[in-house]
A protein has these predicted regions:
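Active-site-proximal loop/helix segment associated with metal-binding centers of metalloenzymes
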Residues: 13, 17-47, 136-227
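Active-site neighborhood of phospho(di)ester-bond hydrolases with catalytic His/Asp-centered motifs
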Residues: 56-60, 81-94, 98, 114-116, ...
Length: 291
C-alpha cells in the first residue's frame, strides 16, 4: 500500500459503550474481559490524505488506544495527532474523548473541527471548544471538508435528535467512496429522508464502493427488560432483508457499531455465520481501505 495514498483505517467498531461494557456480565463482555481479541472500542475512523494530513472521525473514550492503532497501521512510531476531527453527532460515545484534545491532555490549539451547528452548540455549552477552530462550510451550512485528495460530505439522517442532529459521512478518494452510517433510527425514515425506496439504490446513487453500516442490534428482542424504542436502530435482521447479497455487484457491506449484546460479537455464533454466507463482513479495528 502506497504510504501517501489516502487510506481509511477502522479504529473502533462498537456502540458507544464498547465491548466489554461497564458493569455488564453478559457472555460477550466476559469473553472480551478474558480475551482482548474479543474486545471492541467505540466506533471511530482514521483517514490519512495524500499530503500527510490525518483526519479523525468520532472522538471516543478509547482515544489514546485508537490514535496508537492508527499510527501502527500507518507505520508511525508515535500516536497520531490528527489535523482535523469530524463528528457525526453528539451522543456520548462519539464525543466522550473530545476533552482529551484540551490543555488537560494533548494541549491542541486551532485543531479543525467539522460538525453541525447543533453539535458545535453542545460542545460550546460544555466548554469543550477551546482546542478547536470550526471548519468553513458550504453556503447551506452542511458540514464538509476537502483536503489532500479526500473529500468528506455530510448527509443528514434521522436519529434520536434529543441532543443534536445526526449525519452520515461520505468519504471520497480517487479510487474508493465509503459511506459511514454508524447511527440511524430505521430504514423507513432514512430512505424517505434521502429520497430512495431501498438502500441498494441509495448506495448506487452515492457511488459507494464500501458501506460501514449501523449494526447495533441483531433483532428487537436483544435488550432484556428494556424498551428498545428508547434506543432506535434498524436491526441487522431488517438490514439483511433489504441489502442485496454481497456476492452480487454492489458495495462491500461492513457491519459496525455493535452493541455489547449483539451475537455478532461472537465470531462462532450462527448469526456471524449468516453474515459470512450473505457475503458481508463484521468490521474489526485495524482494517484499512485505500481510497
Amino acid at each position: 500500500m502506497d504510504a501517501l495514498a489516502p487510506t481509511l483505517t477502522i479504529l473502533g467498531t462498537a456502540q458507544d459503550g464498547g465491548v466489554p461494557q461497564a458493569g455488564c456480565g453478559c457472555s460477550n463482555c466476559i469473553a472480551a474481559f478474558e480475551n482482548s481479541e474479543r474486545a471492541r472500542f467505540p466506533v471511530s475512523l482514521g483517514i490519512s490524505d495524500n499530503e500527510g494530513g490525518m483526519h479523525l472521525i468520532e472522538a471516543t473514550r478509547a482515544l489514546p488506544e485508537q490514535l496508537k492503532i492508527w499510527a501502527n497501521a500507518c507505520g508511525l512510531d508515535s500516536p497520531v495527532r490528527p489535523d482535523s476531527v469530524l463528528l457525526t453527532h453528539a451522543h456520548l460515545g462519539h464525543i466522550e474523548g473530545i476533552g482529551q484534545f484540551g490543555k488537560e491532555a494533548m494541549g491542541c490549539q486551532d485543531l479543525t473541527l467539522v460538525a453541525s451547528d447543533s453539535v458545535i452548540s453542545i460542545l460550546e455549552k460544555r466548554n469543550l471548544m477551546r482546542p478547536f477552530v470550526r471548519a468553513d462550510y458550504t453556503s447551506n451550512g452542511t458540514p464538509k471538508l476537502e483536503q489532500g485528495g479526500v473529500r468528506f460530505d455530510f448527509i443528514p439522517v434521522p436519529h434520536r435528535d434529543d441532543s443534536s442532529d445526526t449525519h452520515a459521512i461520505i468519504i471520497s478518494g480517487e479510487k474508493k467512496r465509503v459511506l459511514f452510517l454508524p447511527d440511524h433510527d430505521d430504514w423507513e425514515q432514512t430512505l424517505e429522508s434521502v429520497g430512495y425506496s431501498n438502500p441498494n439504490d441509495w448506495f448506487q446513487a452515492l457511488g459507494a464502493t464500501h458501506v460501514l453500516l449501523d449494526a447495533t442490534f441483531w433483532n428487537g428482542d436483544e435488550l432484556s427488560g428494556r424498551d428498545m424504542t428508547e434506543v432506535p436502530h434498524p436491526t441487522v435482521e431488517d438490514t439483511l432483508a433489504r441489502v442485496q447479497n454481497g456476492t452480487l455487484r454492489g458495495p462491500e457491506i461492513i457491519l459496525i457499531h455493535l452493541n455489547h449484546t449483539n451475537p455478532l460479537n461472537n465470531p462462532d455464533s450462527p448469526q456471524s455465520r449468516m453474515i459470512e454466507v450473505a457475503g458481508h463482513s463484521i468490521g474489526r479495528r485495524g482494517w484499512r481501505i485505500e481510497l
